[in-house]
Curated annotation (Swiss-Prot):
Protein name per the record: Small ribosomal subunit protein bS16c
Keyword Plastid in annotation: yes
Signal peptide segment: none
Source organism of this protein record: Thalassiosira pseudonana (Marine diatom)
Family: Belongs to the bacterial ribosomal protein bS16 family.
Amino acid sequence: MLKLRLKRNGRKRQPAYRLVIMESTTRRNGRPVDEVGYYNPITKESYFNKEKIVKWLSYGVQPTETVFQLLKKSNLIEI
């Protein structure tokens, strides 16, 4: 099952995350199927490629809870 989740990068105590499509059994920093954005929790900077995210969600990809909250906050997902 494919998941829309965060992949950590950055230095120690300075996290930055990429928003990626991965198999649910892949380790956190494994090879993604596709990269669809990034999020920096320190500066609150984020970028989400709306076209790619909508495309993957239409294919049935499930976002994790954290990613779901980020997408909801940026008005990409409506409930």
